[in-house]
Structures are given as structure tokens and as C-alpha cells.
Regions:
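Bacterial Sec-dependent N-terminal signal peptides
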Residues: 1-25, 468, 473-475
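Short loop/turn motifs that connect adjacent beta-strands in outer-membrane beta-barrel proteins
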Residues: 21-28, 69-81, 94, 107-111, ...
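Transmembrane beta-strands of outer-membrane beta-barrel pores
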Residues: 33-41, 86-92, 108-110, 117-123, ...
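Outer-membrane beta-barrel translocator domains and adjoining extracellular loop/strand segments
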Residues: 41-48, 93-97, 125-132, 176-185, ...
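Internal, well-ordered domain-core segments that constitute the primary functional module
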Residues: 121-221
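Outer-membrane beta-barrel pore domains
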Residues: 246-257, 265-475
Length: 475
């Protein structure tokens, strides 16, 4: 299906669903503005990372956006939803206006069908405070795709709720056309959760993405056929018509992430421990037996529902420096090595979308490349990260602190990595506050201070002012 056919599909899906619904649905909307007033080469890192590419990288900018959403109700067996967000940025050398979200979704019992560009969070990391998942974060804007998935976890029959599963399958389009026209996305995930009503639950999941198809200026056409889709789905090598690299390895660019987590849920304390890894090369082993076991994201998430002054925080450590060792070989003795996370030599944009890293944003987005290249050039990183939030009277706050060591770039097949003695240190910090305006109903103002200090993103400092109006109407 071409993306131009998605809009009629959205209209048909909404129209059909409207006829099946009872009245008293609600639609939420918002109108927002934000001013970034700063000094330095960029807007501070934390002011743009994990924001779905909503804001400009310029140190001084104005951002405007409006949203309309109708959410699916879990209590209904049949329901529909949709969302639209229009964003705009104005800076000294930049003016951009774009649809950040445009989607429709339908629900039939425990299954959802999503069509379009929808902001989503994939993985078992903390959805609000994390630095970002290893495979998917909230850093890039969503690409258009068609997805079918369960509506969250569903109980397995005859297990009395102690065993639950969730999963999904997506087909998407990289319509930024960076070096390859009509590049496609394949994504699927499956999770299992054990524990049910017990206070301790264990979850394990696996995610698989592949970039494939399209027409490359360097490698020519990469045909979109059912045979190739079968090879992509199962991670098999390419046929005789594929490039030599895809015949030796797997067809397309594949990345797998395994997630393992433990959750403790008490009345006044909710704790989650999570571990995520990446696999770029075969064989795929269980998360605790991979050759790059030193790499991944480890997180602790704590919720204190009854303690408003400090009711949530996250501590995370991430490393991508092991990369299974320096050697990338397929001689039957040594597998993997020089993994080159997010990098693929045949796909100029690598694992990014519209210049923004799709995975963890500390593997720097191509927008930071001074030479204008479209590749990810900093994928050897160690990150120490904290984020917490709370409420004092009517003022909400969120504090984020991050320290990173950036070692540069490792690509597959080089047999060597950059020197681990020479790296760029970076400290990033941000304090955000917000409060409702008493004299203007449904309106909230925000004030933040954000900054960077170090050699990776230079020294940046900004004061960020925002205002937001939110409303609801029923029908």
C-alpha cells in the first residue's frame, strides 16, 4: 500500500467506526507555544532529545503546535480513535511546518489496527522518564505505518491471569528518502509477563526491526516481493538478485532488542528493574548469553504514589562500547564483532528518521553532524542518567541530569575501534517547572532552564518559556 492511500483508509475507518458508537465520546485538543532563548551552538541536548523531533536545534527559536486526539476506550469491545498534531519551528535560519501526527485506529475486542503516523512507546523502559529505549525511543517523529497489535497485555486462557502476552506487527515507510527512495520498515514484537495479581511480575520481550526495499542511488533497486518479505520476516540471507553483502549476511538491515524486567507493585511503592540489549549480527542468543553482554541499558524506575514532593524517579546506565569485540567475521569460528550499532553501509540514514536517531538519542542524531552527512557518527557511548519529578503545592517539576562519555564511531568490518583513551565528556541538565494559571481556565505556563557543558555538544544554556491551553468537547 502506498502512503498516499493511507488518508482514504483513515477516513473509511473513522466513518465505519462512528456508526457503531454510542454518544458521549470526547475529543481533546490543545494549542501550545514555546520560546527557547539561549546561547551556544545548539539548543541544549535535553531540550530536544526524546521530544519526537518537535523542537528546533537552534539556540533561539519559537515552537508552535496544536493537537486533536480521540483516544480508544479500553472498556469498549469496539471503538475507534484518531489523532492530528501540526508542529512549527521558527529560528534564524529555519522555518519548518509539518504534521507530527496523523493517524486513525480501530479496536476489535483485544486487537488494535493503527494506520498513519502515531507517537508510541515501545520497550519496557520507563515511558515518562527514561533516556530512551535501545531500539525505540521518543527521539524521532513517528514514521507512517500500518500496525496490528494487541491492546496491551492480554491474559492467556486457563492461566487465571498469571500469564499474559502482547505482540504486534507493523509495515512502515521511511518517506524521508535519504539516499534510498521508498525504503521500508518491518517491525514485530512479542512479550510475555508472569505473575498476575502477585506483587512481583517478570516480563521478557523481543523486538525485531528491518529496513529493506527501495531504490538506492548506489546499489540500485532492492525489489519488494513476497519472497523478499519472507526473507525479511525470518532474517534470512538475500537471493541471487540481492547485493553481495545481503547474500552473505541477511537481506536488509536487521536489529534485534531483547528486554527483561522485574516489577514490584505495592500500594505505596512501585519499582521496576529493566534490562535491554541490541543484537546486530547472528547468532541471536538469550540476553544473558550474548557476546556483547557488556552493552545495553539497565534501569531502575521507582514510583511513590503517596509522596507528591518526589513521586517518581529513574536511574539508568547505558553502554555501547563493547560491540562484541573489534572483529566482524563469518568464517564459522568468530561470529559478530564490530557491531556498529544503528549503522548500515547500504542505508545512508542508518537507524534514523528525518535526521533523528530512532533508538537511544545519546547515540547522536545525524542532525549534529557538522559536515552534513546523514549517518550516525557517535555510537560508542557510556551514559549515566537520572530523572525525577514531583509536585510542590501547585507547581510540578521534573529534574534530569546526564553524564556521557562519547568515544566516536565503530562500523562493522573495520577490525579496530577508536581509541578508548580519547573521548568527549558531556554533562547535560534540565529543570522543568509548570503550573496552571488561576485566572485563565485550562491554561498552563512552564519555565525551564537547560544546559550542556562538555566537548560533545559544546557549552549551551537556555531559558525556555511555554504556554499551553487544553480542552475537551463531547459529541
Amino acid at each position: 500500500m502506498k502512503f498516499k492511500n493511507i488518508i482514504p483508509t483513515i477516513i473509511l475507518l473513522i466513518s465505519a467506526s462512528l456508526q457503531a458508537q454510542e454518544p458521549n465520546d470526547t475529543i481533546s485538543y490543545s494549542v501550545n507555544a514555546r520560546i527557547n532563548a539561549g546561547s551556544g551552538a545548539y539548543a541544549p541536548f535535553l531540550s530536544t532529545a526524546n521530544q519526537f523531533d518537535r523542537y528546533s536545534f537552534a539556540p533561539n527559536s519559537l515552537s508552535l503546535w496544536g493537537t486533536i486526539h480521540k483516544e480508544i476506550k479500553k472498556a469498549r469491545s469496539l471503538d475507534y480513535g484518531f489523532g492530528v498534531e501540526l508542529d512549527g519551528n521558527i529560528a534564524k535560519n529555519e522555518k519548518r511546518f509539518f504534521p507530527a501526527e496523523l493517524y486513525a485506529q480501530g479496536k476489535i475486542y483485544f486487537m488494535n489496527l493503527n494506520v498513519g503516523s502515531k507517537r508510541e512507546v515501545f520497550g519496557n523502559q520507563d515511558a515518562e522518564l527514561s533516556s530512551g529505549g535501545m531500539l525505540w525511543s521518543q527521539n524521532s517523529r513517528p514514521m507512517p505505518k500500518i500496525s496490528i497489535e494487541t491492546n496491551g497485555y492480554i491474559d492467556v486462557p486457563y492461566t487465571k491471569g498469571y500469564l499474559a502476552v502482547k505482540g504486534g506487527l507493523s509495515h512502515g515507510w521511511f518517506n524521508d528518502n535519504i539516499g534510498i527512495e521508498n525504503l521500508l520498515l518491518h517491525y514485530k514484537y512479542a512479550y510475555i509477563k508472569v505473575g498476575g495479581s502477585f506483587p512481583v511480575n517478570i516480563n521478557y520481550g523481543i523486538q525485531h526491526v528491518a529496513q529493506w526495499g527501495g531504490v538506492s542511488s548506489q546499489y540500485g533497486s532492492m525489489p519488494v516481493t513476497w519472497d523478499n518479505y519472507y526473507r525479511i520476516f525470518l532474517g534470512k540471507s538475500g537471493s541471487s538478485t540481492a547485493t553481495q553483502s545481503d547474500q552473505i549476511n541477511t537481506l536488509g538491515n536487521h536489529i534485534i532488542s531483547q528486554n527483561l524486567g522485574i516489577d514490584l507493585n505495592l500500594k505505596s511503592l512501585i519499582v521496576s528493574l529493566y534490562w535491554q540489549n541490541l543484537t546486530e549480527d547472528p547468532p541471536v542468543r538469550f540476553i544473558s548469553r550474548t557476546p556483547n553482554i557488556g552493552d545495553g541499558l539497565w534501569g531502575l524506575s521507582v514510583r511513590l504514589p503517596t509522596f507528591k514532593p518526589f513521586y517518581a524517579f529513574v536511574l539508568e546506565y547505558m553502554s555501547t562500547t563493547a560491540q562484541s569485540g573489534p572483529w566482524h567475521d563469518l568464517d564459522g569460528v568468530i561470529y559478530g564483532g564490530a557491531d556498529g550499532y544503528y549503522y548500515n553501509g547500504q542505508i545512508p540514514g542508518n537507524w534514523s528518521y528525518r535526521g533523528m536517531t530512532i533508538g537511544n538519542p545519546w547515540l547522536s542524531s545525524p542532525k549534529y553532524n557538522l559536515d552534513g552527512s546523514s549517518s550516525i557518527t557517535n555510537n560508542l557511548v557510556k551514559l549515566y542518567y537520572f530523572s525525577g519529578k514531583g509536585e510542590f503545592k501547585s507547581i510540578n517539576y521534573k529534574l534530569t541530569l546526564a553524564y556521557s562519555e562519547n568515544f566516536g564511531f565503530a562500523s562493522p568490518g573495520t577490525g579496530s575501534n577508536p581509541s578508548y583513551e580519547n573521548f568527549k565528556k558531556q554533562v547535560s541538565y534540565q529543570l522543568e517547572t509548570s503550573t496552571p494559571l488561576r485566572f485563565l481556565k485550562n491554561t498552563q505556563v512552564s519555565l525551564a532552564i537547560s544546559g550542556d557543558k562538555g566537548a560533545m555538544y559544546s557549552n549551551n544554556l537556555a531559558l525556555i518559556l511555554g504556554i499551553s491551553y487544553k480542552g475537551l468537547f463531547g459529541y
